[in-house]
């Protein structure tokens, strides 16, 4: 005699497909939320990497990489010593001090070859930034 097809006597057997689709819907929504949260808002920047080298006396070399989501006509730059979206004209003409890269109360001067700028604090300390 051939075996008879088995039927489930569990009451939640019909709920399993529904639960499975709910689970996958939740997973898709969660992954979309994670993807959305990792996007930057337009016109903002974040620091991705920051390396400091203090091996030389009285001198610290810092390198940072920023990720920016700039609007049309803007490009990644520096404002008040933080990454920011600035007018692309500033970068194109190398007028670095126009983007206000120094902190409040510091003076900004272009390097002679326009490869960067210096920020001079009232006490005389000088911070030099070069663009690469």
UniProtKB/Swiss-Prot annotation:
Q: What is its main location?
A: secreted
Pfam families in the cross-refs: TAFA
Tell me the protein's name.
Chemokine-like protein TAFA-5
**Which species does this protein come from?**
Mus musculus
**Family indicated by similarity:** Belongs to the TAFA family.
> Biological process GO annotation list?
G protein-coupled receptor signaling pathway; negative regulation of vascular associated smooth muscle cell migration; negative regulation of vascular associated smooth muscle cell proliferation; negative regulation of vascular wound healing
The record's tissue-specificity note reads: Expressed in the subcutaneous, brown, epididymal and perirenal adipose tissue (at protein level).
> What is expression of this protein induced or repressed by?
Repressed in epididymal adipose tissue of diet-induced obese mice or leptin receptor-deficient mice.
Q: Which GO terms describe its molecular function?
A: cytokine activity; G protein-coupled receptor binding; receptor ligand activity
Please name the gene that encodes this protein: Tafa5
Any keyword DNA-binding? Answer: no
Q: Which residues form the signal peptide?
A: 1-43
Q: What does this protein do?
A: Acts as a chemokine-like protein by regulating cell proliferation and migration through activation of G protein-coupled receptors (GPCRs), such as S1PR2 and FPR2. Stimulates chemotactic migration of macrophages mediated by the MAPK3/ERK1 and AKT1 pathway. Blocks TNFSF11/RANKL-induced osteoclast formation from macrophages by inhibiting up-regulation of osteoclast fusogenic and differentiation genes. Stimulation of macrophage migration and inhibition of osteoclast formation is mediated through the GPCR FPR2.
Keyword vocabulary terms for this entry: Cytokine, Glycoprotein, Secreted, Signal
Q: Glycosylated where?
A: 113
**Superkingdom, natural source:** Eukaryota
InterPro entries per record: Chemokine-like_TAFA (IPR020350), TAFA-5 (IPR040329)
* Localization annotation: Secreted
Q: Is Hydrolase there in the keyword field?
A: no
What's a single GO CC term here? extracellular space
